[in-house]
């Protein structure tokens, strides 16, 4: 069986890891509390930028601490109910066309993201895709802000793809992978048909050097 593995933020959608949390907080907090939270978040941005440059896995772990204390069920239900309002309009039209092409070929569609599962699950349901995503630890009905396991970034994302391929009898030499950043390189290198989508500078350089396909999706 052939599969198409898609990164989400920046590849399928014009989103980043911060946006879903910001949407949720704005919709569920009184205005003064939201502004207070936003101010604290802004204070963390320099540290996040340094961490992201050093190791994106470190950044992801740091950022997900922002979920600490949030009611888990409320967050899951809100993201499911508000998919159309906040997320659907940010899906690239070209990405939808490509997913449809893969479906017509009989390929299995798989979303692979360093984001958390309940945020991306509505997108996976809408596209009819399997989902490989991070999970947040829960305690007494609230998120602790800690990931279960290692972030699905870099080699972690590639390992998840290899495990999925082994379980589902996927022929990786004939399969496809789509990503937008250097951290997606290990996943892209797993398949016979890697595609750099709206690539950042470092991924573009690697894609050109390795002869990978480069596309711009809107």
Residue ranges and their predicted role:
Residues 51, 64-67, 195-196:
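Amphipathic alpha-helical interaction elements
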Residues 1-51:
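Active-site neighborhood of HAD-like aspartate-dependent phosphohydrolases
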Residues 16, 70, 156:
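Conserved active-site and cofactor/substrate-binding residues in soluble primary-metabolism enzymes
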Residues 1, 77, 84-218:
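C-terminal cap/substrate-recognition subdomain and adjoining C-terminal extension
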Residues 47-62, 127:
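Small-residue-rich anion-binding loops in enzyme active sites
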Residues 13, 67, 153:
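Catalytic cores of large soluble enzymes that bind and process phosphate-bearing ligands
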Residues 58-94:
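Metal-dependent phosphoesterase signature
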């Amino acid at each position: 069986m052939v599969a198409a593995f898609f990164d989400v933020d920046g590849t399928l959608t014009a989103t980043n890891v911060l946006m879903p949390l910001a949407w949720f907080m704005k919709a569920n907090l009184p205005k003064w509390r939201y502004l207070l939270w936003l101010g604290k978040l802004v204070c963390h941005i320099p540290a996040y930028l340094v961490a992201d440059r050093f190791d994106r896995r470190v950044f992801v772990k740091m950022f997900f601490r922002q979920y600490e204390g949030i009611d888990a069920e409320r967050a899951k239900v809100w993201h499911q109910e508000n998919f159309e309002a906040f997320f659907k309009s940010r899906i690239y039209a070209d990405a939808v066309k490509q997913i449809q092409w893969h479906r017509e070929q009989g390929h299995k569609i798989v979303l692979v993201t360093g984001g958390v599962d309940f945020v991306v699950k509505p997108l996976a349901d809408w596209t009819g895709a399997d989902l490989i995503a991070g999970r947040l630890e829960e305690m007494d009905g609230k998120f602790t802000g800690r990931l279960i396991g290692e972030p699905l970034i870099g080699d972690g994302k590639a390992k998840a793809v290899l495990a999925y391929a082994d379980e589902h009898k996927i022929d990786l030499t004939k399969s496809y992978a789509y990503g937008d950043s250097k951290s997606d390189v290990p996943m892209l290198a797993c398949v016979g048909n890697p595609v750099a989508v709206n690539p950042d500078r470092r991924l573009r350089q690697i894609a050109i050097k390795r002869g990978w396909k480069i596309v711009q999706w809107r």
